[in-house]
Amino acid sequence: MLLNIANSIGKRTIRLAQSIGKFSIFSLAAITSIIRPPLYFSLIIKQLLFIGFYSLPVVAMTTFFSGAVLALQSYTGFSRFSAESSIATVVVLSLTRELGPVLAGLMVAGRVGASIAAEIGTMRVTEQVDALYTLSTDSIKYLVFPKVIAAIITMPCLVLIGDVIGVMGGYLVGVYKLDFNSSTYLTSTFQYLEPIDVISGLVKAGVFGFIISIISCYSGYYSGKGAKGVGRATTSAVVNSSILILISNYLITELFFKV
């Protein structure tokens, strides 16, 4: 009994170590491919549109209603302590520091991460990845590099736009539903907002973009055989990306705002 338990733990530990090593080598190969030609500008532009532009409606809707709900809930709580004047500040700081980057990251992970994993996984199953080797093409450079670069570039842009739209959602609720004075609300919005609040959110966005793209590409690149393998790769990409987004969000927050 004890021998079986020890054997099971040993196998899982070895499997985990192998996965970490394989992922580290894969990530290093993707990063070092940046300095090697060709740069595949056409593929990068295509991924910029796919990851950035086509994700904008989802991110905009998410952040808009998050800002609106945040203003509404803050009013419900702060009115008990006659602190309604702090609502605008809470909305803008919550969005720029935390909600904007995290919500955008989770939405992009669900939309883009699943698509990338399914695309590369299907190419692996249908032996298109092997065909790239026969054509003397670096498959990681061709498949992974454009997606990673595009995700790192577009995520901060999406978060910045999402922050503005989220603050707008809070403004509309605050002014037109809660009857705040427009100029007073705007003054409170920017009174305590500092550059570090926005910068920290943009740094998070860039890190989230790298996490989403590299994990999704890795999951698809090493997907199992058949439709079941592609399905597992897709699920793994979304779940692992989401978990690492939340973990890295805490670590970056700790780095920028040491308490």
Curated annotation (Swiss-Prot):
Molecular functions per Gene Ontology: phospholipid transporter activity
**What InterPro entries does the annotation carry?**
ABC_MlaE_roteobac, Permease_MalE
Subcellular location(s) per record: Cell inner membrane
Positions of transmembrane segments = 25-45, 49-69, 148-168, 195-215, 237-257
A GO cellular-component term linked to this record: ATP-binding cassette (ABC) transporter complex
Topology in membrane: Multi-pass membrane protein
Query: What domain of life?
Result: Bacteria
Q: What Pfam families does the record tag this protein with?
A: MlaE
Q: Enumerate the UniProt keywords alphabetically.
A: Cell inner membrane, Cell membrane, Membrane, Transmembrane, Transmembrane helix, Transport
Q: Which family does it belong to?
A: Belongs to the MlaE permease family.
Functional description taken from the UniProt entry: Could be part of an ABC transporter complex.
Q: What is this protein called?
A: Probable ABC transporter permease protein RBE_1340
